Amino acid sequence: VNGVTPPAVQHLTAEVTADSGEYQVLARWDTPKVVKGVSFLLRLTVAADDGRERLVSTARTTETTYRFTQLALGNYRLTVRAVNAWGQQGDPAS
């Protein structure tokens, strides 16, 4: 297997702010070590009225912060995991 398995994401926090009736979330996280070529996959879901999770947004970034905007009030779950250039994924945080 090529490369080093990406490190687990840790210390995931989300700061929510209101903006004209909509909400935005600034997510921050880190990893125990820096690995070259790692990016982060983000998956934001919301609890639907029927109790199931509905996908709201996905994103990929090389930063350790990401801002989601124009969100309605709701019960959200954010999952973040590191992925290397070969597609290997580290343990997620949510």
Give, region by region, the residue ranges found by the protein language model.
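Extracellular low-complexity, O-glycosylation-prone stalks/linkers
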Residues: 23-26, 30-63, 79, 89-94
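Pro/Thr/Ser/Gly-rich low-complexity, intrinsically disordered linker/stalk tracts
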Residues: 1-36, 72-73, 85-94
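Polar/charged alpha-helical tracts
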Residues: 52, 67-69, 85
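Intrinsically disordered, low-complexity segments enriched in polar/charged residues with Gly/Pro
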Residues: 2, 54-56, 69
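Surface-exposed, short loops/turns at beta-strand junctions within beta-sandwich domains
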Residues: 68-76
